[in-house]
Amino acid sequence: MGRSALSCSSSPEASDSIPFRFPTRHFQLPIFEGFPVKILILPDSFKGSLTSSQAAAQIESAARKVFPEAQIESFPIADGGEGTLEMVQKASGGAFLPIEVMGPCGQRVRSRYLSIGETAIVELAEAAGLGLRLPGFSPMKTTTIGVGQIIAEALHVGHRRIVIALGGSATTDCGCGMAAALGTQFLDEAGRPFLPTGATLSMVRGIRLNGFFFGKNAPRIEALCDVDNPLYGPQGAACVFGQIGRAHV
């Protein structure tokens, strides 16, 4: 068996390696003459703790302490959840536009979206993400209304294409809050409008759609996600991803 590119040894005597020190042992990273160490850092977010940009900064800081002569490049990545806006902005430019909206638990939160020409990139996690949950608040009672408020503002200032990054949601309302913020009405059995949450979706008996989203002048709406789960069923989004938010489904 050939020598591993990353080997573990208790005695860092080899002249072609740099000891990478951990509390209980040394790792040897071979250095080949004429080839400097190059490190590429590509972290996604650490759900509920670090965004991809924060993770990249921490990893890069530690790497520079161990390998001060290394060529290090950081490219935070995202899958449609936390950090998507920062990833797109770093790759494509654009300007962050701040906005205050309703958070998933009804609180006011400071959010933002990314403007690139006539396109607005909206990150659901910036308005209804897991990091915005209040302690003890059930995801069956959370709302995506803040996401709709961002979209409404983006349309109001002239954006004609809306791209929504769907990951990292703290909600189970099937986007009803988002639709309500854009003028859609959800009706109960008596025909009265109300705002559905995951706990009250079964009470919806009728829907009045906002005509703004139909016709030749309707904005273009696109969604970003990295899964193909259906809405419901054993492998459905409600069952699989609702449990990440601690919903009992």
In which residue ranges do the predicted regions lie?
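N-terminal loops that bind phosphate or other acidic moieties
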Residues: 37-166, 170-248
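Acidic, Ala/Val/Gly-enriched low-complexity intrinsically disordered segments
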Residues: 5, 13-16, 33, 169
